[in-house]
From Swiss-Prot:
Domain of life: Bacteria
Transmembrane domains' residue ranges: none
Taxonomy of the source species: Bacteria, Pseudomonadati, Pseudomonadota, Betaproteobacteria, Burkholderiales
Protein name, as recorded: Ribosome maturation factor RimP
Gene: rimP
Function statement: Required for maturation of 30S ribosomal subunits.
GO cellular component: cytosol
InterPro entries found in the cross-reference section: Ribosome_maturation_RimP, RimP_C, RimP_C_sf, RimP_N, RimP_N_sf
Organism: Burkholderia cenocepacia (strain HI2424)
SUPFAM superfamilies found in the cross-reference section: YhbC-like, C-terminal domain, YhbC-like, N-terminal domain
Alphabetized UniProt keyword annotations: Cytoplasm, Ribosome biogenesis
Coiled-coil positions: none
């Protein structure tokens, strides 16, 4: 079984989604997990303990294991991610330029079949729509919405 499959099976078996897996040259494994309710420290500890056991049993060599949430600027990789975060502000970088541009920032529309929509501000300030598929994307991320105003 491949490392990604092994980790994804373990993570999903615990009720979480594997968002991303990074393996550094120095033997560090970084695992990013999520679930609709968000991720707590206890969730990260639970997944870490289980993965340590599984990686030992499967004799997978690593120096350090780090499990965390994907953060406010979570990457969007699967069609289900684009469905879940429809209505959110995102940044999308395409593999090939479209109208001389590769990076777009706008409001994500729910996928229609394989086609994903992004409403963005066009050249003249008017609303424009970009339609693309997962195959067109180099990377896509949520744009964090943080409100620093105090609540009284």
């Amino acid at each position: 079984m491949q490392l990604t499959e092994l980790i994804e099976t373990t993570v999903t078996g615990l009720g979480y989604e594997l968002v991303e897996l990074e393996r550094t040259g120095r033997g560090m494994l970084c695992i990013y997990i999520d679930q609709p309710a968000g991720i707590s420290l206890e969730d990260c500890e639970k997944v870490t303990r289980q993965l340590q056991h599984v990686l030992t049993v499967e004799n997978i060599d690593y120096e350090r294991l780090e499990v965390s949430s994907p953060g406010l600027d979570r990457p969007l990789k699967k069609l289900a991610d684009f469905e879940r975060f429809a209505g959110s502000e995102v940044s999308v970088t395409l593999k090939k330029p479209l109208d001389g541009r590769k990076t777009y920032r706008g409001i994500l529309h729910a996928p229609n079949g394989e086609t994903i929509g992004l409403e963005f501000e066009g050249k003249k300030g008017e609303a424009a729509m970009l339609d693309f598929t997962l195959a067109d994307i180099d990377k896509a991320r949520l744009i964090p919405q943080v409100d620093f105003r105090s609540r009284k």
